[in-house]
Amino acid sequence: MAARCAVCGKGPQTGFTVSHSHRRTKRSFRPNLQSVRTTIDGENTRLRVCVKCLKAGKVQRVAA
């Protein structure tokens, strides 16, 4: 399953881990995705949404 937000499309980015001696090692920064039950067109579905979209109110959770 892809690490991509279903609302904004945010995905993994690459960067470096930098040690104290400034040696750099490649790494990936993955978005904080949560599995959320929401209503789309009157039907309950499960989406993987980043926390930034949840906090911004772009997705409304459904009571379990």
Swiss-Prot record:
Q: Which UniProt keywords apply?
A: Ribonucleoprotein, Ribosomal protein
Question: What Gene Ontology cellular component terms go with this record?
Answer: ribonucleoprotein complex; ribosome
Xref: HAMAP family: Ribosomal_bL28 (MF_00373)
Question: What is the official name of this protein in its record?
Answer: Large ribosomal subunit protein bL28
Q: Identify its protein family.
A: Belongs to the bacterial ribosomal protein bL28 family.
Q: Which InterPro entries match?
A: Bacterial_rp_bL28, Ribosomal_bL28, Ribosomal_bL28/bL31-like_sf, Ribosomal_bL28_bact-type, Ribosomal_bL28_sf
GO terms for biological process? translation
Q: From which organism does this entry originate?
A: Bifidobacterium longum (strain NCC 2705)
Q: Could you tell me one molecular function GO term of this UniProt entry?
A: structural constituent of ribosome
Please name the PANTHER family in this protein's record: 50S RIBOSOMAL PROTEIN L28, LARGE RIBOSOMAL SUBUNIT PROTEIN BL28A
Q: Which Pfam families match?
A: Ribosomal_L28
